[in-house]
A protein has these predicted regions:
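Short glycine/proline-enriched turns and hinge-like loops at secondary-structure junctions
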Residues: 60-62, 128-130, 156-161, 174-176, ...
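Flexible, small-/acidic-enriched active-site or ligand-binding loops
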Residues: 131-133, 185-215
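N-terminal glycine-rich flavin-associated loop
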Residues: 80-100, 126, 138
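A short core secondary-structure module
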Residues: 144-192
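Alpha-helical interface subdomain recognition
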Residues: 1-75, 96-101, 108-112, 139-141, ...
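A short, charged helix-loop
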Residues: 205-232
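Glycine-rich phosphate/pyrophosphate-binding beta-alpha loops
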Residues: 125-126, 152-158, 236-240
Length: 312
């Protein structure tokens, strides 16, 4: 649609003007993206844009959101990781949280004033939501919960202001997993950076929960019902990861084309050799295939198709 093209073009102009020039220096120095860039993402719909207007969102469809996310990923993958992780968490709070939780946490998250992490992955079970070993037990004295365990490879984990943590609240044989909002500064909660090869400006974190006392009000939804939450939002996340991969691949393809046009060999640009042309054509084919597959998954989500999970 025309409005989608206009939104994409405006975002592309912004990325080229205000984001692309600073990426190299920030990645080399491992500096977090400036907070004003994070806040700017809100205006383009990347923080809460999928939510209905009644919840403060823009009611974007998944195809449009994915297209914008791919553009951001192709420009600065670290900023994309920071934004999409925070958006995932604010979506959970908006759609599954209580009115009190929405009122307390959503406005700042949607403005980009605060950032969030998604605390699922663990050392021994990966992202298997049914097998999490982190536990939360009721605290009779406070009426809240005591959280104990460890999460690993968590995007935004080192610098986020809050996050959603999945913890077992039932026996090991069932899927009684619950979701809790954990805030930075809570006693017993600590985080450290985990080295990663790429995306240096959005470091991964190891999160430790040493008898963290959580208020009862920080439980999202009903006790023991978070397995379905994790499953739903992981499907959503996979769709957008496909867009991200397409965006990064397209950026690499464009760089390859630029290089092939500049690099001289035997008196002419290497892009004039048939072998290089074939390689570039194969790249373009794969980039377009990945983009179309991502769009197919997003369209299935928009149509609420029964086979959406298969495409995601």
């Amino acid at each position: 649609a025309d409005w989608q093209r206009a939104a994409s073009d405006a975002f592309a102009d912004y990325l080229a003007r205000d984001v692309a020039p600073i990426v190299g220096a920030h990645e080399r120095e491992r500096r977090l993206p400036p907070r004003e860039l994070v806040r700017a993402m809100s205006g383009y719909g990347l923080l809460g844009g999928l939510l209905p207007e009644a919840l403060g969102g823009q009611g974007l469809d998944h195809v449009t959101y994915g297209t914008l996310l791919a553009q951001l990923a192709g420009t600065w993958a670290s900023l994309r990781s920071m934004i999409s992780t925070s958006n995932l968490v604010l979506s959970i709070i908006a759609e599954r949280g209580s009115a009190e939780q929405r009122e307390r946490f959503l406005p700042a998250l949607m403005r980009g004033d605060t950032l969030a992490f998604f605390g699922l992955t663990e050392p021994n079970v990966g992202s298997d939501a049914s097998g999490v070993e982190t536990r939360a037990e009721r605290d009779p004295a406070s009426g809240g919960w005591r959280l104990r365990g460890r999460k690993l490879y968590i995007s935004n984990g080192v610098h986020a202001d809050l996050g959603v943590v999945f913890a077992r609240t039932g026996s090991g044989a069932d899927h009684a997993v619950s979701a809790f909002i954990v805030e930075r500064g809570m006693a017993g909660f600590s985080a450290r950076e985990v080295y990663a090869m790429g995306m240096h400006c959005c470091p991964l974190g190891e999160l430790l929960f040493d008898d963290v006392l959580l208020p009862a009000a920080n439980l999202i939804g009903a006790e023991g019902q978070a397995f379905a939450i994790a499953k739903h939002y992981l499907n959503l996340g996979r769709c957008f990861v496909a867009y991200v991969c397409a965006g990064v691949s397209e950026a690499a393809y464009k760089e390859a084309c630029r290089y092939a046009g500049q690099r001289q060999q035997f008196g002419r640009p290497i892009g004039q050799f048939q072998l290089v042309q074939q390689m570039v054509a194969d790249m373009m084919t794969r980039v377009e295939s990945s983009r179309l597959l991502a769009a197919r998954a997003a369209d299935a989500l928009d149509r609420k198709s029964a086979d959406a999970q298969r495409w995601c």
